[in-house]
Swiss-Prot record:
Family membership noted in the UniProt record: Belongs to the formate--tetrahydrofolate ligase family.
PROSITE patterns: FTHFS_1, FTHFS_2
Protein name as annotated: Formate--tetrahydrofolate ligase
Pathway: One-carbon metabolism; tetrahydrofolate interconversion
Root EC class: ligase
SUPFAM superfamilies named in the record: P-loop containing nucleoside triphosphate hydrolases
Top-level taxon: Bacteria
Keyword Oxidoreductase: no
CDD domains: FTHFS
Length: 559
């Protein structure tokens, strides 16, 4: 089989104006083209759609992933193509890839095989410049903080309390902790600082949760960058940074329109990680999709304990959206991995391991159905090494839980390989809801109680423990009036626990909170657990070493 980049390179793409006009009814005058195959959809035009009825929202999530990944984006694209092939007006709403994983371990995030969004190389690299705009706005605020201190510190900022970090879209562990302002008085006031990856930043979260230009500026102004020496919060608005930062993001918050390999429309916009951020594409893009199409397929990062929980408890809570059905992606190899099989042996048939690994899938299904009231369908994303017996067993066991499951071969077959899944999703959408939609916790709980609710109800933890510094920070956040905000838990994606090696569906484990960060502009509190880092490092053999540029300008090795 051809590689992802070879498949994408051989595709014949429709002009983006044609995709917009024929698939979505958007006139060319409402697009801001970035070449022939990608464009931003004008915000003024999107605002004019406010009275249109909303389509149905399909959330694609997964069981706890294995290191190679289970294909949520690929399934989202394949399902969109399948719905499109069935004559439905469907659109995908996906996250933009970060160049950190592209050049690191995971690789790109534009789908795979014959279920990709294109132009794949553009999307995986600079795309329309959204991440660069976010980084510029973020780092402008960092510069204004240090400049304010250098020129007299009128706000009396306690430099030891500054929490705002610089960012870049690269995995670079050497920049996690740095000292700035060295070299004497002309270079500013020396202080400890650090870098986060763009997709873990508060500004990325603001970008993805904002609903308008006014909302963008308000949220940016609400950012708390640190505290005065008297203990009062200091905001971006206090520094006069909100206007300039909003200007840098004015055009970027317009959703990006591209297409799948089969010509279906896709809005690819925003890209927070789900393990160290809230893991969902932008509200602007999702709401646009719901007004432009009858069916919106969107994905939330990693397993349902991370991306789907945050989709529901953060994105839905703030936007008022509700998923009509969740498609939970499972693979035979992931089930065997959670059933105790080593990575090197996942290609061997093992029905016993498949059955043991179903505990992990079942907990995700139970959480979505019974805790949040979201109907579920299982997509068995089939790999060539899966046997018929293994796939049939997954379908049987899911059915025994009361959840329909469908084999999908969209990676190798494109949209036609996901048509059974699409028909199953359409059927699920026609059935009356059995449970009422609900959040994992109400707003009025304390921050401690909210973390405990996620830990015990979603993760199956027995207790939550707090490092002393984290507990003090939490108390200060509540004292400053932010106790009603939702929580965004940052933890490993590989387990319900904070131990990536604790697979399956563990119970009674301890959730250790190491650090707490206030994201007042985004509107949530980040709770960092275990050993999670908000600036990843590169692996022993980075993907960057396999990517090259041919003499004719062709990009090689991007996946």
């Amino acid at each position: 089989m051809l590689s992802d980049i070879e498949i994408a390179g051989a595709a014949t793409l429709r002009p983006i104006t044609e995709v917009a006009t024929e698939s979505l009814g958007i006139g060319a005058e409402h697009l801001v083209p970035y070449g022939h195959y990608k464009a931003k959809v004008g915000i003024t035009y999107l605002n004019s759609l406010a009275d249109r009825p909303l389509g149905r929202l399909i959330l694609v999530t997964a069981l706890s992933p294995t290191p190679p990944g289970e294909g949520k984006t690929t399934t989202s694209v394949g399902l969109t193509d399948a719905l499109h092939g069935l004559g439905k007006r469907a659109i995908a709403c996906l996250r933009e890839p970060s160049m950190g994983p592209v050049f690191g371990l995971k690789g790109g995030a534009a789908g795979g095989g014959y279920s990709q969004v294109v132009p794949m190389t553009d999307i995986n690299l600079h795309f329309t410049g959204d991440f660069a705009a976010i980084a510029a706005a973020n780092n402008l605020l960092a510069a204004l903080i240090d400049n304010h201190v250098h020129h007299g510190n009128e706000l009396d900022i306690d430099v030891r309390s500054v929490t705002w970090k610089r960012v870049l879209d690269t995995n670079d562990r050497a920049l996690r902790e740095v000292v700035v302002g060295l070299g004497g008085p002309p270079n500013g006031f020396p202080r400890q600082d650090g870098f986060d990856i763009v997709v873990a930043s508060e500004l990325m979260a603001i970008f993805c949760l904002t609903e308008s230009w006014a909302d963008l500026k308000r949220r940016i102004g609400d950012i708390v960058i640190g505290y005065s020496r008297a203990g009062a919060p200091v905001t971006a608005r206090d520094l006069g940074a909100d206007g300039a930062m909003a200007v840098l993001l004015r055009d970027a918050i317009a959703p990006n329109l591209v297409q799948t390999l089969e010509g279906a429309p896709a809005l690819v916009h925003g890209g927070p990680f789900a393990n160290i951020a809230h893991g969902c594409s932008s509200v602007m893009a999702t709401r646009a999709g719901l007004r432009l199409a009858d069916y919106v397929v969107t994905e939330a990062g990693f397993g349902a304990d991370l991306g789907a929980e945050k989709f529901i408890d953060i994105k839905c809570r703030m936007s008022g959206m509700r998923p009509d059905v969740a498609v939970v992606v499972a693979t035979v190899r992931a089930l065997k991995y959670h059933g105790g099989v080593a990575l090197a042996d996942l290609d061997r048939e093992d029905l016993g391991a498949v059955e043991a690994g179903m505990d992990n899938l079942r907990r995700h299904l139970d959480n979505l159905r019974h805790l949040n009231g979201v109907p579920c369908v299982v997509a068995v994303n089939r790999f060539p090494t899966d046997t018929d017996l293994e796939v049939v067993r997954v379908v049987e066991l899911a059915a025994s839980y009361g959840v329909p499951a469908y084999q999908a071969t969209h990676f190798t077959d494109g949209g036609i390989g996901a048509q059974d899944l699409a028909k199953g999703v359409l059927q699920a959408l026609e059935e009356p809801a059995r449970d009422e939609f609900s959040f994992t916790y109400p707003d009025e709980l304390s921050l401690t109680e909210k973390v405990e609710a996620v830990a015990t109800r979603v993760y199956g933890a027995g207790q939550v423990t707090w490092d002393g510094k984290a507990r003090k920070r939490l108390a200060r956040i509540e004292r400053d009036g932010y106790g009603t905000l939702p929580v965004c838990v940052a933890k490993t994606q590989y387990s319900f626990s904070t131990d990536p090696g604790l697979l399956g569906a563990p119970t009674g484990h301890e959730l250790r909170v190491r650090e707490v960060r206030l994201s007042a502009g985004a509107g949530f509190v980040v709770v960092i657990c275990g050993d999670m880092m908000t600036m990843p490092g590169l692996p022993t053999r980075p993907a960057a070493t396999r990517i090259d540029l041919a003499d004719d300008g062709t990009i090689i090795g991007l996946s």
